[in-house]
Amino acid sequence: MKEIRYKAPYRLKKGYKSDSGVDVKIWSIDLIDEKLKGKKWVDPYIILPNQTIHAQTGVYLELPEDYECQVRPKSGISKQGILVHFGTVDSGFRGEITVAVTNVTNKAIELEPRQKIAQLVIKKKDPVELIRADEIDLDTDRGAKGYGSTGKF
């Protein structure tokens, strides 16, 4: 088992032994809306309809060069109409992990301090080299068929 060093004001742990990721919490909020910039976060924080914020997690990782960390939404927060944007933490990054969060509903939603907001999944990277080509082989069962190509249901 690979050990990854981290710094955080709380313990990172899996909910269940078989889980892929560890939960991270809202530690503070950065208001990126120009009208609200510089205002203090008041507990609980009300995220307005269509508002995007950056939720700081208080978590710093020391990833080995051949690892990455994926920031993924938690299903429970998604049920509330909160979109947690997928993100990647590269191995060379040593800053605080921040999660972009958007309220996609037409009503205000409360975010509590220390609320679980996302999960971190740490993966070993496979080394790849992208080679530019003039042609791409389209001879697969799918070919270039994109959105909706498998039908509605």
What are these regions (language model features)?
Residues 1-153:
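DUTPase catalytic domain/fold
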